[in-house]
């Protein structure tokens, strides 16, 4: 499973959008991202606006034409990923058009610095920008409200941010100047949709409590194999008389 940190590597651009699937309900996006493409192989995971996608082409070459480890994206700076209807309907990727900017991040590697917080790339919902950055305020779906707390972490379009204020149906974050320039958050205007991912730890804690976390954890083991009863060894007295118990 890929794990991200919400620290954007590069702000890329949508180069092309085409339909995929028998019904044409899916999309293939081609992105221009010179920095990221140099590090990318076909099959790698990439967070696009906080949504985990798989690279199916790198440098304009499909997976079938690429050898393992070949990074042809170095030459063109382009790569492609597919998104199914489920992803398009649950995120803001369904509204992407040619020329749109996107936030891109590669998964956390062994030894990398955890600069933000643990992000799965599984978008929990979308919010609408109410006030633009730097004092970014976003609408909060009722189903996610209980996971967003003051001074807690939240991911907005793939960017790890600290919650400043939580309201009944919205939350606010402070976006620093660097983040405004290095990500799409500096370009978002009121009314636009952003992807939201809440803290996964909060979701696991809720699940444990609802399932009855007072029951202690006990590791399970396979049932012991059933074997025939071993014969009872003769007693010392029986061995002395040369007889055995019946």
Residue ranges and their predicted role:
Residues 1-246:
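Conserved loop->alpha-helix
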